Amino acid sequence: MASEPVIAKDTVSLAITGSEAIQQPVCTFASGGANMANSPSYSGSGTSWTASILVADGDTNGDVTFSCTFEDVAGNAGAAADTTADTGDIEVENTHPTVSAFSFNDVAMKTGDTPTLTLTFSEAVVGFASGDDVTCPNGALATMSSANGGVTWTGTFTPTANTEDDTNVCSLGTSYTDANGNSGPSSDTANYAVETQAPSVNSITMSDTALKTGDTSTLTIVFSETVAGFASADDVTCPSGSLGAMSLQSGTTWTGTFTPTGNTDDDSNTCTVATSYTDSAGNAGTGATSANYDVDTVAPTVSSISLSDTDIISGDTPTLTIEFSTAASGFASADDVTCPNGALSTMTSSDSGVTWTGTFTPSGSTTDTSNTCDVGTGYTDDAGNTGGTGQSANYKVDTVAPTVSS
């Protein structure tokens, strides 16, 4: 027998040469002191025979020994041929490599994480190639390398972007062996989670997008998933007003109250969500912008109010002209303008509500040197802001006809 270690499915062959022609010998084989499981087979004739046995997976590790008996063709028994247990010619080495450890140093992976996969065997292995022997879903495993002769192997795993899967295991195949050729078992890591899906804003809306004095609007932000580290003061900007602290209404919906700034007229505003928030895994969020909203909290005012004639006598019908700072809505001269000692006709506008004119007819038989036309606050601008008051300069009414005293 040649001197080398053998493993399961190897064949051990024993050459037997007789001093004369012999019949088929009968041999028994043992390894490590225990009979080997399989029965030997024989070939040959005359003085030259071969006894062969297939090593079984369960054969005991240790030196292979044998004992053979034989007879010549006449039936005379020859001296038995055998070996002792410590000859060391051939040794069975049936110990299979096993996996001692197979794990990640991080099992909750987010964007930017690159955990290390460590695989430790019970002994040095050969024929191991991580690209062929290890599969890790939802990511890419770099080529694994060993710094201790093939016992421990490490490699970097990069999770796939835009992926959300909390059920994953790396699997080891069985194509590797130890130095003697014994195959190893398969193995799986513990579960790991891949969460590289960035949270985003599904919607950001104002309940009122045309804001006037006294209005408040509810800002509602709906995220794609539960978020962490979200603070409205830091993460949301809404110009031309102030946003109160936002509160969580459900797992993904936040609301806050927006109050427009006074004396502001700006028809181009959007609320913006920054990227400083994260999801529960730590992935940074994406920004978002609301639709446009209009802030008009500037109250309309009376720019001027004047009569074309302030010394009014019988037969005079001066024109009253009122100019507002912006187009006035809901303005009705009968309700909103008072001019004593006379009657004001219905006022009309030819420029969409900014300038209004009407005719004043003084009362008859009246003498009054102290009069003003006054504008009330019943009108608004187009946004609905209540207007301010106005007052004309003084005018005189003298419609008393002179008489002959004597």
Describe the predicted segments one by one.
Residues 1-406:
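Non-catalytic beta-sheet/beta-sandwich ligand-binding modules that flank or precede catalytic cores
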